[in-house]
């Protein structure tokens, strides 16, 4: 049953794969592998609660630890467990590939940002390379606001100026903090 599930998984037929993986989750031979793949499929469909439950069941096994570190940091971030996301992200960072390091930097930086630890957020926000090499307005805003909170108004102004042409809440907040930053530099 595991092999059938894996065949469906590699063919990207997750519904059938899940059916077969669920048949072997309690197996001594294939249970942990089935749980890992069920967790991965849940993660890919943004069902982070289920993914986390599956991953927690196999997190003590070395062959999955390295693969799951990034997923668990990301899931905890998306579930609002920011301190846990930071802890997992920091643990995973030295073992990660270059492309994962950028995403982990974003997870750690945004988690610190949400925890209002702006001084700790700054280096990680700066290390983030952006999606396909590009930052979005929220990325610039968070970096600008972290600078603003550190009373580094010159750098805050630089970041806020990158996004004030938008018509959304992020741009409105940027305008407000940009004005505040200019007032505090005079």
Each predicted region: which residue ranges?
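Acidic, polar-rich low-complexity tracts and alpha-helical solenoid repeat scaffolds
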Residues: 1-186
């Amino acid at each position: 049953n595991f092999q059938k599930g894996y065949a469906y998984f590699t063919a990207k037929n997750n519904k059938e794969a899940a059916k077969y993986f669920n048949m072997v989750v309690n197996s001594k031979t294939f249970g942990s592998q089935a749980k890992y793949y069920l967790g991965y499929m849940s993660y890919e469909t943004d069902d982070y609660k289920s993914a986390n439950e599956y991953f927690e069941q196999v997190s003590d096994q070395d062959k999955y630890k390295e693969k799951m570190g990034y997923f668990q940091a990301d899931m905890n971030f998306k579930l609002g467990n920011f301190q846990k996301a930071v802890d997992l992200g920091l643990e995973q960072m030295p073992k990660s590939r270059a492309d994962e390091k950028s995403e982990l930097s974003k997870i750690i930086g945004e988690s610190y940002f949400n925890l209002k630890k702006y001084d700790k957020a700054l280096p990680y926000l700066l290390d983030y390379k952006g999606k396909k090499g590009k930052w979005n307005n929220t990325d610039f805003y968070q970096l600008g606001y972290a600078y603003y909170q550190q009373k580094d108004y010159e750098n805050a102004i630089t970041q806020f100026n990158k996004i004030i042409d938008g018509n959304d809440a992020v741009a409105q907040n940027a305008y407000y903090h940009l004005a505040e930053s200019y007032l505090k530099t005079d």
